[in-house]
A protein has these predicted regions:
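Structural signature of Gram-negative outer-membrane beta-barrels, strongest in the C-terminal barrel
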Residues: 1, 6-8, 193
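Outer-membrane beta-barrel architecture
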Residues: 4, 77-79, 136-138, 189-191, ...
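Extracellular loop and loop/strand-boundary signature of outer-membrane beta-barrel proteins
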Residues: 60-65, 117-124, 165-168, 172-177, ...
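C-terminal beta-signal and adjacent terminal beta-strands/loops
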Residues: 100-101, 149-166, 191-247
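Transmembrane beta-barrel architecture of outer membranes
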Residues: 130-134, 185-187, 228, 238
Length: 247
């Protein structure tokens, strides 16, 4: 059994300045206001190019050391093996991760963003689930080993929470922002040690062919992927075979 606590504080993180950020900085520099980047007004002037009529012709978006992050997480891992004598052995394994804090400051002087409570920025910056986990049970006997895996993704913001920037957002159609429930998929594998240097394997991912179909009602019809493809796969069940020979 292992329990770990992590606390990462990252400063001067490299970030690409966006076109919007630079155009806003240009406006601020021209009007004697503090600009919203760590770049000088001379840099901003060099990076934003306009023609004689003042029309925008080019914006150079450089990478600068501007962002900072604060992340806290706890992880728990466990492994156990039980000898069954002539019936082989059972292997158990499990991992759990809980994000306790996830804060981002995108630019110097900018507001600190709490990604755990802000569905828009949670999706925009990292696209993560607060809680994730996996468990596996394996059985080894003679030359055979079979394993069943379960992969767990905790609740995540739905699309309306992201676009409405709040879990309380209600669309004009009456559709409500909120969270998707937890999502679990199962994988299986079977290995046969034919020889000391030859292993045959059969693997099935997403055994029950689970798909994020329930999410599509929350998306507009013009979205190419009506689900959060950062977490969920549209491929469904996948079966593969492998022959491994060690030289």
């Amino acid at each position: 059994l292992s329990v770990d606590y992590y606390n990462w504080k990252i400063k001067n993180e490299v970030k690409t300045l966006s076109t919007d950020q630079l155009l806003l900085a240009e406006y601020q520099c021209h009007n004697g206001l503090p600009n919203n980047t760590s770049a000088s007004c001379q840099n901003v002037t060099d990076w934003v190019t306009r023609d004689a009529g003042g029309n925008l012709t080019r914006v150079y978006t450089p990478k600068l050391n501007v962002a900072s992050q604060n992340l806290e997480a706890v992880t728990v891992g466990a492994k156990y093996q039980q000898d069954l004598g002539r019936f082989g052995s059972l292997m158990f394994s499990g991992n759990y991760t809980n994000m306790l804090k996830r804060e981002v400051v995108a630019l110097p002087g900018a507001q600190k963003l709490d990604l755990l409570s802000d569905p828009y920025n949670m999706w925009y910056y990292d696209n993560f689930a607060k809680v994730r986990g996996d468990v596996s049970v394996g059985w080894a006997i003679s030359k055979f080993t079979t394993t069943v895996y379960a992969n767990y993704v905790g609740s995540t913001p739905n699309y309306l929470a992201y676009t409405g920037r709040s879990y309380d957002y209600v669309h004009a159609s009456g559709a409500k922002a909120g969270k998707w429930g937890s999502y679990t998929t199962y994988n299986m594998s079977l290995n046969y040690q034919a020889q000391d240097d030859l292993t045959l394997s059969l693997m099935v991912n997403n055994v029950f062919n689970k798909l994020p179909e329930g999410q599509r009602y929350n998306y507009p019809g013009n979205e190419s992927t009506p689900f959060n493809d950062g977490f969920y796969s549209v491929y469904g069940r996948q079966i593969s075979a492998q022959v491994k020979y060690d030289f």
